[in-house]
Amino acid sequence: LIALATDGRRRGVIGLPLDMVAMEQGIAGLVPALRPDGWADAAAAIMTTDTRPKLASARLSSGAVITGIAKGAGMIAPHMATMLALIATDASIPPTDLDRYLRVAVEESFNRIVVDGDMSTNDTALLLANGAAGLAEGDPAEFQAALTGVCIALAQAIVRDGEGATKFVTVEVGGAADEANARRIARQIAISPLVKTAFYGADANWGRILAAAGYAGVALDPARL
């Protein structure tokens, strides 16, 4: 069962036709070699400019497992980018529930990262449930938390492996009127070139952070900053 896949799952140079003959020949040879412990090989196979594979997994109290792989290092910005995230569970879950779970997880993970502030024409987050364990997802809250945790781990791995990245920075906003305002401020800080250069140079110029927050389009009380 496929929960969600955005259009355009192809990677590579934009505008060049995909060599379907090579793809079909490759698939024909790969299918007989499929095995349950092939996740690490799959994570390595989808790498492009990545320097290391990205893999995360979680086990539920029911015994079901959620495992995911991802690729991405450049053209990474909020609302996804030139990245792939392929996640599977052996729990038995209806597609409508999978879709809901994945949308929440993606919003709290892949849609909150940035490397270079640029995006691509193609990206995908895919969640499959094959029901092989013969188990339901159990507690919905537990499944959601586990799936979100897997997605966050993969998203953070993408940032840590960002092209030219030397630092991993988390932006936390407190005291905002609502979630939307907090996200706008955090995103503006995260994509600010001046904030990035300050972190790169280990320059504690917090004024750049305030400036970025100030032009995020959200009402601010300077006395609370």
Each predicted region: which residue ranges?
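A glycine- and small/hydrophobic-rich beta-loop-beta segment
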Residues: 130-201
